């Protein structure tokens, strides 16, 4: 009986660690992404975030997000998006329906860029066929 309990506990621990370490995005060929990540990219574009953070998230007057997303958690990102950093010129997006609905996709997109898995430029849905050169 104790052996069975240990096996179940080990299995549960392994299963939870896999879920925790899973990427928040799915990407193929650098620019084909899952629907949530694609919506995050569209949110990035609609909000014109590149004006401060650069077209490739390299930073301009705002910090380089390809570096920042290596250091902050998803929860910290959410708090930052909602509250902003007014003292540094970062607006809050608490009143933005678009951000309220798509902040997780925006996080997934930026995390994928930060991880080097998603390339800069136009993204397409995972199921869209992409012409190979």
Regions found by a protein language model. Name each.
Residues 22-36, 46-47, 91-133:
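Flexible coil segments in periplasmic/lumen-exposed cytochrome c-class electron-transfer proteins
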């Amino acid at each position: 009986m104790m052996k069975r309990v240990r096996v179940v506990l080990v299995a549960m621990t392994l299963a939870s660690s896999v879920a925790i370490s899973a990427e928040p995005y799915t990407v193929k060929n650098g620019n084909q992404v899952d629907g949530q990540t694609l919506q995050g990219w569209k949110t990035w574009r609609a909000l014109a975030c590149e004006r401060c953070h650069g077209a490739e998230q390299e930073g301009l007057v705002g910090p380089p997000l390809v570096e920042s997303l290596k250091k902050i958690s998803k929860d910290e990102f959410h708090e930052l998006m909602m509250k902003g950093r007014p003292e540094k010129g970062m607006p809050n997006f608490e009143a933005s329906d678009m951000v309220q609905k798509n902040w997780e996709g925006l996080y997934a997109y930026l995390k994928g860029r930060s991880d080097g898995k998603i390339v800069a430029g136009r993204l397409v849905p995972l199921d869209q066929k992409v012409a190979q050169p």
